[in-house]
Amino acid sequence: DMRENITRRAPVRVIEEFGIRVARPGSDVTIASCGRMLHESLAAAALLENQHGISAEVLDVRILAPLDKKTLLQSVRKTGRFLVVQEECAHGFGAYLVATVADEALEHIQARRILILGTPCAFAPPPRFWHFHVPTASLITAQVHTLVQE
């Protein structure tokens, strides 16, 4: 049996909190991300604050099911603008977050659109092309600046 050959080990760190964590409070725009894109989003939030005076609230989406709608919607209602940053294709977890915001907080959106930054194709590109597709802090900053100016 294959299961007998699998070594089980304790997790390095137990995550006690699930849902969405406000990684950086802000008031002008909500940026939702997870994993590696959280670090790019935090870097972009610092650039936005320092260079443009834009206060970005960054959400760390740690689990989707069940979705922490309360934290997500509270942030979007406060800022009025919403951007999802993800590494995967644009149809990934961001589409679920955008649908939730559109269903339950659309009247609070001040911008003409809600953005998803991610790979614009149905499949992930080969690793040597990732730098063309993965959102960076500068790309996030440019998109948020455009979103706030609308």
Residue map of PLM features:
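Thiamine diphosphate
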Residues: 1-150
